[in-house]
């Protein structure tokens, strides 16, 4: 059995299929981890969603911001944006089944056998793995329950920007959701910044990548994530970023996680 992880699909299924053929992926024996953002901006969002869903237990995907945005559109609590490419999903005869499947995906997955943790964007420095798992569970429980339309409506916004155990209600769930699906930069005191999206080096002096904050409590937890195409392929600080900008005409990256030496492979995207 081999365990592979792949960066953001964002509706780009053809490059994924090329990578899986390259490694001779066998759904009966292997497992594919996806960092989230299965849909949007690319030309094959419906096909990508169906493909990953049909892999069953051979695929583990976490939710990204574009996935949650699609769910919000489906629920009627947010409008389709000009650059969205999700209309084929909204028009599909199996829309309800696909949305129900997507709504039940996790925000975090941890495999103790290989000691890797999968999430879409990042973790605030105040959280260790146990806290991250507990916070993910809080949002997942609501997302899978009767109040999920309200969560999908209330998740939009950048506040609060600082974690506190005393956070409650929708503000708490919004902060958790933002960290798992949108986070890139933090300040030294642990405040999160959702505005700047560029590569490290171009940010304001008080900002640093979430994984570079001194004293980060998740140090020692190996985390594979995506979301950050301007960062690109990055390995260091116990983290692995696999978003290499496929939807922007760059590359899609696949990594084998269960080998002693990390193996990565790429395919061009058009």
From Swiss-Prot:
UniProt enzyme class: hydrolase
Keywords assigned by UniProt, alphabetized: Hydrolase
GO molecular function, one term: bis(5'-nucleosyl)-tetraphosphatase (symmetrical) activity
Domain of life: Bacteria
Reactions mediated catalytically: P(1),P(4)-bis(5'-adenosyl) tetraphosphate + H2O = 2 ADP + 2 H(+)
Enzyme Commission code: 3.6.1.41
Reported function: Hydrolyzes diadenosine 5',5'''-P1,P4-tetraphosphate to yield ADP.
PANTHER family: CYTOCHROME C5, PTHR40942
Family label: Belongs to the Ap4A hydrolase family.
Protein name as annotated: Bis(5'-nucleosyl)-tetraphosphatase, symmetrical
Species assigned in the record: Thioalkalivibrio sulfidiphilus (strain HL-EbGR7)
């Amino acid at each position: 059995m081999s365990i592979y992880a792949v960066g953001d699909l964002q509706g780009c299924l053809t490059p994924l299929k090329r990578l899986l053929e390259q490694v001779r992926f066998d759904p009966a024996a292997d497992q594919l981890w996806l960092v989230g953002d299965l849909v949007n901006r690319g030309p094959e969002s419906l096909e990508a969603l169906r493909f990953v869903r049909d892999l069953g237990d051979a695929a583990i995907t976490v939710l990204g911001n574009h996935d949650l945005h699609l769910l919000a559109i489906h629920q009627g609590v947010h409008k389709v944006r000009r650059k969205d490419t999700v209309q084929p999903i909204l028009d599909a005869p199996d829309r309800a089944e696909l949305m129900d499947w997507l709504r039940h995906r996790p925000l975090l997955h941890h495999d103790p056998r290989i000691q890797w943790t999968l999430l879409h964007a990042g973790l605030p420095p105040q959280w260790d793995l146990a806290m991250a798992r507990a916070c993910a569970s809080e949002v997942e429980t609501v997302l899978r329950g009767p109040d999920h339309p309200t969560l999908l409506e209330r998740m939009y916004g950048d506040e609060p920007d600082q974690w506190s155990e005393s956070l409650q209600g929708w503000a708490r769930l919004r902060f958790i959701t933002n960290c798992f699906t949108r986070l890139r930069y933090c300040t030294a005191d642990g405040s999160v910044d959702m505005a700047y999206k560029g590569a490290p080096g171009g940010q304001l002096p008080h900002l640093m990548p979430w994984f570079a904050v001194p004293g980060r409590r998740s140090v020692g937890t190996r985390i594979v994530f995506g979301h950050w195409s301007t960062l690109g392929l990055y390995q260091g600080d116990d983290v692995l970023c696999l978003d290499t900008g496929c939807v922007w005409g760059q590359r899609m990256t696949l990594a084998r996680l269960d080998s002693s030496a990390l193996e990565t492979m790429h395919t061009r995207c058009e």
